[in-house]
Curated annotation (Swiss-Prot):
Homodimer. Part of the ribosomal stalk of the 50S ribosomal subunit. Forms a multimeric L10(L12)X complex, where L10 forms an elongated spine to which 2 to 4 L12 dimers bind in a sequential fashion. Binds GTP-bound translation factors. The keyword Ribosomal protein applies. GO terms for biological process: translation. Keywords: Ribonucleoprotein, Ribosomal protein. InterPro entries: Ribosomal_bL12, Ribosomal_bL12_C, Ribosomal_bL12_C/ClpS-like, Ribosomal_bL12_oligo, Ribosomal_bL12_oligo_N_sf. It comes from the Bacteria. Belongs to the bacterial ribosomal protein bL12 family. It comes from Methylobacterium radiotolerans (strain ATCC 27329 / DSM 1819 / JCM 2831 / NBRC 15690 / NCIMB 10815 / 0-1). PANTHER family: 39S RIBOSOMAL PROTEIN L12 (PTHR45987), LARGE RIBOSOMAL SUBUNIT PROTEIN BL12M (PTHR45987:SF4). This is Large ribosomal subunit protein bL12. Forms part of the ribosomal stalk which helps the ribosome interact with GTP-bound translation factors. Is thus essential for accurate translation. One of its GO terms (molecular function) is structural constituent of ribosome.
Length: 125
């Protein structure tokens, strides 16, 4: 812990030019670019309309309703999420509820088709 405190003190005493040189050295050593991260972070703030046009990359698969085949839907929810029988049943009966969050578009479409085949009504958000 004392080493970290010393490191913080050393970094705090750097001039702006020394800090910029340090950033460049770390970028080279780690093979990353801090400039790209800054550009990405600044992008949405600059143009809200451009962000709206961008295609969504992460989706939440939401179970809107179980439909008539509730048992089949519970089985599919268990297979997808790894939940136990009671937890999957509670999720299905408590619809609308998210089944899986932060999934890629192709996986979300696959899960939607799988659950709809079992009889569920699914929304992608």
């Amino acid at each position: 812990m004392a080493d970290l405190a010393k490191l913080v003190d050393d970094l705090s005493s750097l001039t702006v030019l020394e800090a910029a040189d340090l950033a460049k050295m770390l970028e080279e050593k780690w093979g990353v670019s801090a400039a790209a991260a800054v550009a990405v972070a600044a992008g949405p703030a600059a143009g809200g309309a451009a962000a709206a046009v961008e295609e969504q990359t992460e989706f939440t698969v939401v179970l809107a309703s179980a439909g008539d085949k509730k048992i089949e839907v519970i089985k599919e929810v268990r297979a997808i999420t790894g939940l136990g029988l009671k937890e999957a049943k509670d999720l299905v009966e408590g619809a609308p509820k998210p089944v899986k969050e932060g999934v890629a578009k192709d996986e979300a479409e696959k899960l939607k088709a799988q659950l709809e085949k079992a009889g569920a009504k699914i929304e992608l958000k």
